Each structure stands twice: as C-alpha cells, then as structure tokens.
Swiss-Prot record:
Organism, scientific name: Limosilactobacillus reuteri (strain DSM 20016) (Lactobacillus reuteri)
Molecular function GO terms recorded: 3'-tRNA processing endoribonuclease activity; ribonuclease P activity; tRNA binding
InterPro entries noted in UniProt: Ribosomal_Su5_D2-typ_SF (IPR020568), Ribsml_uS5_D2-typ_fold_subgr (IPR014721), RNase_P (IPR000100)
Role of this protein: RNaseP catalyzes the removal of the 5'-leader sequence from pre-tRNA to produce the mature 5'-terminus. It can also cleave other RNA substrates such as 4.5S RNA. The protein component plays an auxiliary but essential role in vivo by binding to the 5'-leader sequence and broadening the substrate specificity of the ribozyme.
Top EC class, one word: hydrolase
PANTHER family: RIBONUCLEASE P PROTEIN COMPONENT
Reaction catalyzed: Endonucleolytic cleavage of RNA, removing 5'-extranucleotides from tRNA precursor
Keywords for the protein's UniProt record, in alphabetical order: Endonuclease, Hydrolase, Nuclease, RNA-binding, tRNA processing
One Pfam assignment: Ribonuclease_P
Name of the protein this chain belongs to: Ribonuclease P protein component
EC number annotated for this UniProt entry: 3.1.26.5
GO BP terms in the entry: tRNA 5'-leader removal
Family the UniProt entry places it in: Belongs to the RnpA family.
Amino acid sequence: MRKSYRIKKESEFQRVFETHNSVANHKFVVYQMEKPGQKHFRVGISVGKKIGNAVHRNWVKRRIRQTLLEVKPQLRSDVDFLVIARSAADGLSMAETKKNLVHVLNRAHLLDEKSED
C-alpha cells in the first residue's frame, strides 16, 4: 500500500482515536473518522506488545495490510481508520484474518458493498 494510504503520525492517530467512533469483534478494533472530500481512504495499523515479539507483530501487520489490499476497491474513500489487532488475532491464518477483518469492516460500514469472502 502506498504511503499516501497510511496514517503514520501520532497526532493523526490521536485525532482518529478522539472521535470515539469504534467497532470491534473478538480479534480486531476499528476506529474511524469521516473525511469528506478525501481522494482515498487512509489507514493506520497497530499491533500491541502483547502479541509476540517484533517479528511476529510485523507478520500480523503484513496479513492485515494484505487483507486491506484485497478489499481496497470496496473500501470507502471518505474515511481515515485505524485497525488495532487484539491479542486474540495472534496466530490466525490468512483466511481467518481476512474473514475477521472483513466482518469488522462491514460492521463499521467501511465497505461499499457487503462482502463475505
């Protein structure tokens, strides 16, 4: 995913957190903030230290990014959102990661059309 699709600055993360607009399931939490007029969505990914070591956390982040790339055409363009992996997301297969992440994105109304891959 290109850099223009990422939220990297702490201040931008905090702005999205402060909206208190979140949806969660057992594996992931998604915070979102409406940004009317934005060309494309932006996403921040956070995996806490409760999940393994740095190598393992990066592995989880790669799976989240891959899932987002696969559903990218369906994602709304007028939002910034954060995906936070809970400790239950540790050890998920790629298929399980996609299923759980798509579920929480649907609950947050971030996907334009219902997807149950």
